Amino acid sequence: MNSGIDLQGTFIKSLIDLGIPPGTAKAIWMPLPMILMLIGATVGVLVCVWLERKISAAAQQRIGPEYIGPLGLLAPVADGLKLVFKEDIVPAQADPWLFTLGPILVVLPVFLSYLIVPFGQNIVITNVGTGIFLWIALSSIQPIGLLMAGYSSNNKYSLLGGLRAAAQSISYEIPLALSVLAIVMMSNSLSTVDIVNQQSDYGILGWNIWRQPLGFMIFWIAALAECERLPFDLPEAEEELVAGYQTEYSGMKFALFYLSSYVNLILSALLVAVLYLGGWDFPIPINVLANLVGVSEANPVLQVVSAALGITMTLVKAYFLVFIAILLRWTVPRVRIDQLLDLGWKFLLPVGLVNLLLTAALKLAFPVAFGG
């Protein structure tokens, strides 16, 4: 198996070669992954917002952003700057502490979840053995922030939106976790890196989507509900609740909700790519490519090309799923709250349990194909 390029080791070694003490070199490296994560997630959101506006315009036979930068690429930046410089208003009867804490509790867990997303063999901020468990734990914090935002606003629409958001998030977390448990069972690991490695032996034929089509559908539907994307955007349904739990928010606090929504969408797409679509894995195994060009897998140039290909493949897979999510916004009608809860509790939950039991049975019956 290709061990990948060791970015941390290479960076620290380069600094040591320049005469910097090893301790100082390690200290310089420590904040870099977090800074890169924040920059990468923010740029990803800007790209996602631009795509949403252009795809939405195309779906409605419009042009969309056109004049703010080439092809309107700077329109999301203009939107962000506008929100940053807007006045931050706190309603007179609101609870100021909870009102401020709500958006922070919503956006922080989403950013922290990026810690376990691998873009390559060694291109991951923290490869912890319980990465999937960490992500599930972090995602369960978000409903608390949504409830805080809805309750503290002292507004009936905000409260209803917060209650809807919490109910929706809790309802779909369980099917989401069940679909992931089936993947964990096949991979014998909670590490996202191990899960991708388990899919890398046979190229595109080794991807988990072929062995877990049911789990893939459950995960994708539940992820859309967690991100509050149409047809599951009931917490902020404009026709019913003005803007839901965001009704009383303005300025930077509103921007945090806006940011959280898109960061969560990209995170969900990345996790689908990692868990079901082989992550950074190229459809043709790297050892086959190495044999075709007649070089060793340990060749430094091949390692760099492999790392670049890995990042590209992960992002291509993720943004294809983002494209599907945006397209769904204009093709599927919004469901009612009772339909949404029925889908989560009466359909996805039982199907998720059956899928988990079926995976366990297939693992015992066909250990080679299902990771026995």
Swiss-Prot record:
Which keywords has UniProt assigned to this entry?
Membrane, NAD, NADP, Plastoquinone, Quinone, Thylakoid, Translocase, Transmembrane, Transmembrane helix
Q: Which cysteines are joined by disulfide bonds?
A: none
Compartment annotation: Cellular thylakoid membrane
Q: Recorded E.C. number(s)?
A: 7.1.1.-
Which residue ranges does UniProt annotate as crossing the membrane? 27-47, 65-85, 97-117, 128-148, 166-186, 204-224, 266-286, 308-328, 347-367
Example GO biological process term? Answer: aerobic respiration
What is catalyzed by this enzyme?
a plastoquinone + NADH + (n+1) H(+)(in) = a plastoquinol + NAD(+) + n H(+)(out); a plastoquinone + NADPH + (n+1) H(+)(in) = a plastoquinol + NADP(+) + n H(+)(out)
| Gene Ontology MF term list | NADH dehydrogenase activity; oxidoreductase activity, acting on NAD(P)H, quinone or similar compound as acceptor; quinone binding
Give the matching InterPro entries: NADH_UbQ_OxRdtase_su1/FPO, NADH_UbQ_OxRdtase_su1_CS
Q: Does the keyword Iron apply?
A: no
| Topology class, membrane | Multi-pass membrane protein
Q: Which GO terms describe its cellular component?
A: plasma membrane-derived thylakoid membrane
Q: What class of enzyme is it?
A: translocase
- UniProt KW Lipid biosynthesis keyword: no
Q: Name one Pfam family in it.
A: NADHdh
Q: Tell me which family the UniProt entry assigns to this protein.
A: Belongs to the complex I subunit 1 family.
Q: What role does this protein play?
A: NDH-1 shuttles electrons from an unknown electron donor, via FMN and iron-sulfur (Fe-S) centers, to quinones in the respiratory and/or the photosynthetic chain. The immediate electron acceptor for the enzyme in this species is believed to be plastoquinone. Couples the redox reaction to proton translocation, and thus conserves the redox energy in a proton gradient.
Q: How does it assemble?
A: NDH-1 is composed of at least 11 different subunits.
- Output this protein's name: NAD(P)H-quinone oxidoreductase subunit 1
Taxonomic source organism: Nostoc sp. (strain PCC 7120 / SAG 25.82 / UTEX 2576)
